[in-house]
């Protein structure tokens, strides 16, 4: 659903922030 997709997107963004800190 929309909520699950948003959650996945948030998790992916969080991982990117950890792996590639600006």
Swiss-Prot record:
Keywords: Amphibian defense peptide, Antibiotic, Antimicrobial, Cytolysis, Fungicide, Hemolysis, Secreted. GO terms for cellular component: extracellular region. It is found in: Secreted. Expressed by the skin glands. Transmembrane segments: none annotated. GO terms for biological process: defense response to fungus; defense response to Gram-negative bacterium; defense response to Gram-positive bacterium; hemolysis in another organism. Its main location: secreted. It comes from the Eukaryota. Has very strong antimicrobial activity against Gram-positive bacterium S.aureus and yeast C.albicans, and very weak activity against Gram-negative bacterium E.coli. Has strong hemolytic activity against human red blood cells. This is Antimicrobial peptide 4. It comes from Xenopus tropicalis.
């Amino acid at each position: 659903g929309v909520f699950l997709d948003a959650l996945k997107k948030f998790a992916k963004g969080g991982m990117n922030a950890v792996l590639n800190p600006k």
